[in-house]
Amino acid sequence: MWSLTASEGESTTAHFFLGAGDEGLGTRGIGMRPEESDSELLEDEEDEVPPEPQIIVGICAMTKKSKSKPMTQILERLCRFDYLTVVILGEDVILNEPVENWPSCHCLISFHSKGFPLDKAVAYSKLRNPFLINDLAMQYYIQDRREVYRILQEEGIDLPRYAVLNRDPARPEECNLIEGEDQVEVNGAVFPKPFVEKPVSAEDHNVYIYYPSSAGGGSQRLFRKIGSRSSVYSPESSVRKTGSYIYEEFMPTDGTDVKVYTVGPDYAHAEARKSPALDGKVERDSEGKEIRYPVMLTAMEKLVARKVCVAFKQTVCGFDLLRANGHSFVCDVNGFSFVKNSMKYYDDCAKILGNTIMRELAPQFQIPWSIPTEAEDIPIVPTTSGTMMELRCVIAIIRHGDRTPKQKMKMEVKHPRFFALFEKHGGYKTGKLKLKRPEQLQEVLDITRLLLAELEKEPGGEIEEKTGKLEQLKSVLEMYGHFSGINRKVQLTYYPHGVKASNEGQDPQRETLAPSLLLVLKWGGELTPAGRVQAEELGRAFRCMYPGGQGDYAGFPGCGLLRLHSTFRHDLKIYASDEGRVQMTAAAFAKGLLALEGELTPILVQMVKSANMNGLLDSDGDSLSSCQHRVKARLHHILQQDAPFGPEDYDQLAPTRSTSLLNSMTIIQNPVKVCDQVFALIENLTHQIRERMQDPRSVDLQLYHSETLELMLQRWSKLERDFRQKSGRYDISKIPDIYDCVKYDVQHNGSLGLQGTAELLRLSKALADVVIPQEYGISREEKLEIAVGFCLPLLRKILLDLQRTHEDESVNKLHPLCYLRYSRGVLSPGRHVRTRLYFTSESHVHSLLSVFRYGGLLDETQDAQWQRALDYLSAISELNYMTQIVIMLYEDNTQDPLSEERFHVELHFSPGVKGVEEEGSAPAGCGFRPASSENEEMKTNQGSMENLCPGKASDEPDRALQTSPQPPEGPGLPRRSPLIRNRKAGSMEVLSETSSSRPGGYRLFSSSRPPTEMKQSGLGSQCTGLFSTTVLGGSSSAPNLQDYARSHGKKLPPASLKHRDELLFVPAVKRFSVSFAKHPTNGFEGCSMVPTIYPLETLHNALSLRQVSEFLSRVCQRHTDAQAQASAALFDSMHSSQASDNPFSPPRTLHSPPLQLQQRSEKPPWYSSGPSSTVSSAGPSSPTTVDGNSQFGFSDQPSLNSHVAEEHQGLGLLQETPGSGAQELSIEGEQELFEPNQSPQVPPMETSQPYEEVSQPCQEVPDISQPCQDISEALSQPCQKVPDISQQCQENHDNGNHTCQEVPHISQPCQKSSQLCQKVSEEVCQLCLENSEEVSQPCQGVSVEVGKLVHKFHVGVGSLVQETLVEVGSPAEEIPEEVIQPYQEFSVEVGRLAQETSAINLLSQGIPEIDKPSQEFPEEIDLQAQEVPEEIN
């Protein structure tokens, strides 16, 4: 039973008896003197006599658990306590011996695992009555998920909404399951997909997650880790029919789970790991262990850990947290479990357990012992950024990837069945209906089949619908044999007097016609396999924009981002419009960005957020603005002229003098003649396809993406019919579709060898290069008006993203307290980066680029770099698939926090994938040039433009770029050889210390090791030239690469030295590019050809945050003012009837004392673990110990962090309750997010202007009526209730004495600011009272938000309510609340609480922000713009 390998004469340092295989303790124990060596101790041990009293700690668990590495490490440390002896009960004893024969012990550590006889352990505890570390009776409950959830609910711990399905014949009332296609109903509770299905037994790890059909359907099947897999995707969508299960709501966690490990109620270690539901691949390190990352818990999460520990009476307890929607939810409690591979945790755990045991048992053994109180030396690990600028925010707007050609058919329908369908799905509410779900499309198909059957019986019956159109509708809906829900949709629009009547204007005779519906069927437009590869590769390339790392895990590009993301230092959100191709592009990009594997469906569901509910990325393409109609009509008129372009045509069609536009017009000359040629080529093409179909060899011919010759012919025949109308005129709107189709066939179906496609591509591209960009406006003013109309919500969101970046980081920080000796190999870069990725369609990309080009960001006459950028953009002919607009925000920590140089913005752009016809003709840009603090002089001066005329630039992805002083590229410059390119594909480029004689002192790059040494991380061999590491080496975003290169410089293989001379000719600035697919060795199964993606080009790298913020605000305001003028008359007529009662009252923060966690030594160990446990790997859990270095406190009144406000304000658009008007919308929208016991805490907002500018409002106070008037005029739709500004100011003045809920640490400048704010507040309120008549101009729909109390008291007096978005005249939409971290933590310095109260009082007063009217109004409805549908064919 007992394995005692040591002699009876042992030293005072007790040992850990493991049998003959014990390898010893390894390191000195706590009781050892540091000057004693191990040999001296061993010699002394023979002469020493062990002390009489010994506390025996018994370990009763299965051998696999009791001899695991974590248990061994902890017990070794536990043995270093004097008076403690650890004994392990063997598995044979536990299983086969009666409990009476088990040796007695004073303290028992026992826990259940598979095969463990828990009944015997309970019997033993009753027999011997030892001190239990983990309660045994409660372990029965932990084995049943139903009991776990019941206990969690009783303790008031948040958990996902769930229902239990008990398949028990004795209780049939608990087994009511109704399964639908996209939902299940369990005992009356409905769970729409995605939902989770868990077996009730906690020992059964076969958890299934079911996905909605709109995301591809199927399920992810989770299981206990087997090798490198933890889940697998299955196409099965039906729930299990046998067994009892818990069904619960799926929580979107952005692909990471948090595992929490408690040791007593006051210690909790947390780690993040990749969610097994994401792709099922277990990330392992070089030793084969699952990679996990340290995470800092918030105050509320520490409270949850304490509750779990106490409720289940388990001192050592592990549980799973899901962070979603601004809250933390417990989804599983595992009982006894240890952290793996954390030396710090082993030390902490052993110390806490030892102290707990000694505190409980030492008195009865008369052992002199007290808890050690010496201060622990925990140095702060310094950051490595030095003086480099730190990447803080990346915002990218990206077009979707390569797709199949989009196709559309319109028909007018009048059958009652279509009207019934329209009514059933609520079409009459808005007059429009969009049907995408499989069951909806099935209804349309059923109606179509029924009408066709009736037409066969009665060809001359009452059915008015055209047979040909109905048959096409039927064939499209029947394609593929099933509805995927993302590649076909039907739109119905109601016309009260028939479609033609509405089209032809006010015709009295027409108005008597019966109403009809316009049915628009859209299909195609699916993301192709090539598009998926493009998106995934671009995602991999994007990794390299983030801070890099060192150590064992730095063997591949972009490893810095991966560890950044998993440690929650990366605040990532991916948004996509509701189009399937856009969502799949976003999912594929996320897969590459985060090195995920497996199917796209689970990634899409968990990582991609739909932004279609508020117009952020979607636009109602069927309703064009009046400006778009004018532009389209003028464009069609010019292109219908059968004559060569004259000077006046150039003035009319190309007033902006765009280089690409002029080039295309030169090619076209006579538009009608070119259209004749295009039409003849299409006729020839359809003739060739028909001939191929007659060829017996083509019977089973499969084209790209499973298309057949019949479908291909259908595509081209429809274009042939539609392009030339019966009148002989051409429908110019079909030109983009023709170009789309021929580009697709040349790229993907080139093997057919159809004649004339190259010429058709050349001519249709020339026409498309005129039509497509000019549809978004011809003159600068039109381009800007249409652009802002498309992307106003997105512009506001980008502005919010930039302003939210400099927020308090205490929520997302890694653990700041870390032993230096534990820091080696820890994946924890000290950065916090916010990333917002917006995937959308061509319209938004065109529009956003137009805003930057024509909105007046900079004066090109004064800024040479911006002039070069505009010249480059002017030469871009097409914004192709995967076009990117990237905004990067850096912070220079060496600058004064109030300085304009503190934050630095860069603007980058890529026109997406290369067209197949563009070899050698692409315009050259300025290179990718992130600013570097070590090359300040290069910021604005580098990168002179090459000749923008076509044909001058190289087609190489890493083509040469000259800097200003350099001579032009010589004709003899060799291109980079395939050998170098191949080697680059297999390894990460790192710095070589070779120096160049060229200006600027660039350091060039070569391979660090052969491809075979490349660590496999999911990148494969397709990671060629992803990002210009030449730039990254000196870039503010990747300073660590320099260190990496210096440390690895001597490892350069001979192969790279052989090409050093050639490398010296490599351009100084290479581009961020994805160029793998051109190389023959880099093929991709299922892809005919994946075009190269153009590298990112820097448009400007010396912008300040203030410049960009003011520019975006100005553009938004200009649009708002323009619409206000159009609706001023309507506003004036409505405004007199508005009441101005019930003014907005700002929410008050209530004071609540910090939660006191009392130490209760008389209780079992799960109630307290003693003072030494107050410092945990997740930071101090108890407020009794105040650490000056810690940045978190403990409060039972948590506050949501700024992510909530961001999602709320930037996306959700504060809700307006019908009938209650504007006076209620001000606080309703925000209060939805708070629990009843919480009080709203204002999120941190830091103004980019110095504090000294706070005094500015004082000077502008006399003009307070003007901003109010401006705001009033800016709204085109009246609200029903109007707040009175004068009353509001009065109320703010009266409420000025309320104290704040929490007292953060106050910095000195902020104290000055607070006094200034008090002065401003008093002056403003006094002025409001004196000038109530002037001020009382009603501001409809606008709630003026008072000055905010924020972390460190950055009072944003100079920046008005950033996001008071009121969606006027439209129903309130659901507000997405995806927040990675739920709560904001503040440090509370107890000693300074009293003296800081006065400063708090000053700041808690309501301060109306009057110097800048609200910038944030949604796009108002243009009452004059009528939808004019296209001609029905």
UniProtKB/Swiss-Prot annotation:
Residues 1005-1020, 1134-1143, 1187-1199, 1236-1250 have a biased composition (Polar residues). Its EC number is 2.7.4.24. Residues 915-1020, 1134-1199, 1235-1257 are annotated as: Disordered. It is an enzyme of class 2 (transferase). Residues 382-453 are annotated as: Polyphosphoinositide-binding domain. Gene3D superfamilies: 3.40.50.11950, ATP-grasp fold, B domain (3.30.470.20), Phosphoglycerate mutase-like (3.40.50.1240). It is found in: Cytoplasm, Cytosol; Cell membrane. Substrate binds at K64, K65, R224, K225, K259, R273, S337, F338, V339, K340. GO terms for biological process: inositol metabolic process; inositol phosphate biosynthetic process; inositol phosphate metabolic process. GO terms for molecular function: 5-diphosphoinositol pentakisphosphate 1-kinase activity; ATP binding; diphosphoinositol pentakisphosphate kinase activity; inositol hexakisphosphate 1-kinase activity; inositol hexakisphosphate 5-kinase activity; inositol hexakisphosphate kinase activity; inositol-1,3,4,5,6-pentakisphosphate kinase activity. Residues 1168-1186 have a biased composition (Low complexity). Pfam families: His_Phos_2, PPIP5K2_N. Its main location: cytoplasm. The modification Phosphoserine is found at S944, S987, S1037, S1073, S1145, S1152. Widely expressed, with a higher expression in skeletal muscle, heart and brain. GO terms for cellular component: cytosol; plasma membrane. Changing R417A: Decreases 16-fold the affinity for PtdIns(3,4,5)P3. Keywords: ATP-binding, Cell membrane, Cytoplasm, Kinase, Membrane, Nucleotide-binding, Phosphoprotein, Transferase. It catalyses: 1D-myo-inositol hexakisphosphate + ATP = 1-diphospho-1D-myo-inositol 2,3,4,5,6-pentakisphosphate + ADP; 5-diphospho-1D-myo-inositol 1,2,3,4,6-pentakisphosphate + ATP + H(+) = 1,5-bis(diphospho)-1D-myo-inositol 2,3,4,6-tetrakisphosphate + ADP. ATP binds at residues 145, 198, 205, 224, 248-251, 257-259, 275, 320, 332-334. The C-terminal acid phosphatase-like domain binds PtdIns(3,4,5)P3 and InsP6. Despite its similarity with the phosphatase domain of histidine acid phosphatases, it has no phosphatase activity. Bifunctional inositol kinase that acts in concert with the IP6K kinases IP6K1, IP6K2 and IP6K3 to synthesize the diphosphate group-containing inositol pyrophosphates diphosphoinositol pentakisphosphate, PP-InsP5, and bis-diphosphoinositol tetrakisphosphate, (PP)2-InsP4. PP-InsP5 and (PP)2-InsP4, also respectively called InsP7 and InsP8, regulate a variety of cellular processes, including apoptosis, vesicle trafficking, cytoskeletal dynamics, exocytosis, insulin signaling and neutrophil activation. Belongs to the histidine acid phosphatase family. VIP1 subfamily. This is Inositol hexakisphosphate and diphosphoinositol-pentakisphosphate kinase 1. It comes from Homo sapiens (Human).
